[in-house]
Amino acid sequence: MARMVQCIKLNKEAEGLDFPPLPGELGKKIWQSVSKEAWAGWLKHQTMLINENRLNMADARARQYLLKQTEKYFFGEGADEAAGYVPPQA
């Protein structure tokens, strides 16, 4: 049976992650309160931030930036939007 969590991002009960996605306290916090669906949404947003901002993941500053954005995305006021990104029309 799947582990269920009250997802902080989607505001509903949903299937939780199988393991903490990051090391440390942030990973534990995400594992306890973020669903697989919300995590998949973050991975898409993270990819967009990396590509649009041309982040070099070998650079420690880029990795720290993404960790801060991860925390803001789930537990803060929301992550940065990629500069120049225009969402598709519905």
UniProtKB/Swiss-Prot annotation:
Top-rank lineage group of the source organism: Bacteria
InterPro entries, per the entry: Fe_traffick_prot_YggX, Fe_traffick_prot_YggX_sf
GO molecular function: iron ion binding
Gene Ontology, cellular component aspect: cytosol
Keyword tRNA processing (UniProt): no
Pfam families the UniProt entry points to: Iron_traffic (PF04362)
NCBIfam families: PRK05408.1
PANTHER family: FE(2+)-TRAFFICKING PROTEIN-RELATED
Protein name per its UniProtKB record: Probable Fe(2+)-trafficking protein
